Amino acid sequence: MNKETCMKEAEESILHTYNRFPVVFDHGDGVYLYDTDGKEYLDFAAGIAVQAFGYHNREYSEALKTQVDKLMHTSNLFYNEPITSAAKRVLKASRMDRVFFTNSGTEAIEGALKAAKKYAYTRDGHAGHEIIAMNHSFHGRSLGALSVTGNKHYQEPFEPLIPGIRFAEFNQLDSVKALINEKTCAIILETVQGEGGIYPATDEFLQGVRALCDEHDILLILDEIQCGMGRTGEMFAWQHYGVKPDIMTSAKALGCGVPVGAFLMTERVAEKSLAPGDHGTTYGGNPFVGAAVDTVLKMMERDRITEHVKEITPYLEQKLDALVEKYDFLTARRGLGLMQGVVCEKPVGKIASAALEHGLVVITAGADVLRFVPPLIIGKEHVDEMAEKLDAVLEEM
């Protein structure tokens, strides 16, 4: 199928929920993608922070092929070895106590919200609890996750959403404090806001929220779906801050392309929250997914991925800062590790489109931010190539 046929038939058959770029990728290798015409692209999007090890990683591919040939699915009515091994690895990496595997990030958020509500129900003997979320946040598009996503543009067509959600301002502790009442059972936030424009939490804010939660017996839910799995130089971004959540969510690079998410919790929460019959999934945590997650976590630990991210991050920041200094319409850079954003006064969608013409894949975050979330295996030579290509694009603006 050629490019034009693929695009035409996709437009005729797939629901129009995305404004896609006119590119059909055929295969990938390392940090590069190749379209159906054979054109090469340096990938600084990684499938929206998914492909931590890039493309065509032989160890990962072989692990999945082996598991496909052996056993893919049996249901959660039975035990399976791959997901048990994966569970032990993710709990070790996160220093949490219990995990539930889902099919996606938004499902992980749904499970986290249910766990928080059930915890409060068990503790207090009644329902009707509230949750505090953040403005400009993004947690997913299913109804529960959408209810805690602080963006009216996403929410309005689907109202009424889940009641009892109150929104505070990210990185403004007093805003959170003002919303706490006797009904508050949880506070949910992204450790680094992604779709909202790449805003890391400040130390004062995240540590302050943790203290408020401890004071009022409120559960802290940290969304690590985009910023977790080594992207910031720690396995999970909250590990930079000297705090620990009661519940956290993960997805994206957790499976490196295999659809999988997870919500994790401390033993204290697990003892009072979800019990048999409270939650479930048909596909979640099957042997195939287990092989993917187990392999990803094994490779990350063995290859010291977080150390590599810490080493390469200053070089990426230096190159992006140089571009901000050069172009007046670039006004700031912010981010943590290999999750960076550059604020732009010109249309970022047009810049991302123009970058494709130059063989560079970058994406946007909100209306005015160029987002850089490359595979975690990039080297200095890839950062140099990105900066050179992006410089050429910006010259044309």
Describe each PLM feature range.
Residues 1-397:
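Conserved N-terminal phosphate-binding loop of PLP-dependent enzymes in the Aspartate aminotransferase
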